[in-house]
Amino acid sequence: MKKKVSLLVAIMMAALIVLSAVPAMAEKTVITYWSNDRHDETYMTDMINKFNEAHDDIEINMVIMTDDFENSILLAIDGGTAPDIIGQSVTLKNMVDYNAVVDLAPYIQADEEYQKVTNALNLKFEGLNAIGDAIYWVPSGQRSGVRIEYNKALLEASGFEGIPATLAEYVEMAKKMTADGAGKTYGIGFTSSSPFERQLEMMAQVSGVFYYDYKNGKFDFSGYKPFLEAGRELVAVAYPDQQGVDNMRAMFAEGTFALWGNASQEAGVFTNQFPITAFEWGVAPVPSLDGEIKGALQVNPNKGYLMLDACKNKDAAWEVIKYFQSEEFLVGYMEGGFDLPITSYIDERIDKSKMGRMADYSLLDYESVYPAVPTINLMGDDYRTQLWNAIMGHMEIDAAIEDLNTRYNAAYDEDISLGFIKRLVIEDYDPLHPSAGTVTWLDK
């Protein structure tokens, strides 16, 4: 009996020795990514799940927040709860001044595959994704300029075939459709989230009006007056409640109003997030003041990823960024209709027949990237808020414009005098080719 017990003890001890020699499963490094994009949520989630299943060392945790994105990030940094990676929808200078973000140039320069796929070293836009030699994010694609999305059935019911070329005709179209809707449907709808930017500001752009005078290096809002006057007429006949952007998208998809303005992300929104099934919808260029194109429509390099300095596992975070911008990931993203390609490498590899409604947002020959306007320490409302307040009748139009010219230029001059920024001047600036001029930075 004693021999049996001794043998059993010996076997158990041997088993314990063997088990203790087996290494414990290492805990995954969790990399948290904050995004303010919801239109691509399904694709991002599926690809993140694929990554997490294939990797036993890194796990990606995505959090989507669409409200107050930049402030939420800064608060999280201050509170010690910051994510590791964020989407690019922030003001770069603010994040750099806050010492919040990491220069990715060393990672990029050491990775030839990443350079090949993203063309990262040639997609540096001063003040937008890069400052000097530092690169803080690399665009995966580009968002088109604003288009007019429209309900074909409501237009046809009021006798219209498409979107007119002039702002005056556009206003009259909205008025007639609202009148014909008799309180059930409306000609146009505006969101409470940056409404000026989504239509009227871009109509001004293609009319040659921009808020920064690149040739003379100063702010000038004077050209917006006719667009504000037209805006008052549009608001008077619009759907009467300006709600958040997703609520207004849902109402457009339900047929509540006929005219909506936004960029190429709406291809995914109205296919996946709020699929339109009850009517046919069209996409058209924004009208200009007189029907002529006198300025470029702004496109936005996008879907970039910034690494926060608070990240404790920067090499792991870089692996996640590399995955998000890998060939497989980006080809699927573009074919899913979530964005437009920004590099020839990806453009040549996507099957454009799979892009769905994104094809309706193919770039126009007058779309371009604008040089980033210097970020200033402004007191009071920004120009988009104030100009919309003028449209809503909360301020006189002339007074609103005069106040903006005064406040913006005073703040600009002050920041330059203190050495915070330099004056941006492009003497050979061409509004139809805004990125083609020679940039000069002045100390006064």
Give residue ranges: language-model regions.
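Long, aromatic- and glycine/proline-rich binding clefts that accommodate carbohydrate-like moieties
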Residues: 120-121, 281-288, 334-391, 421-444
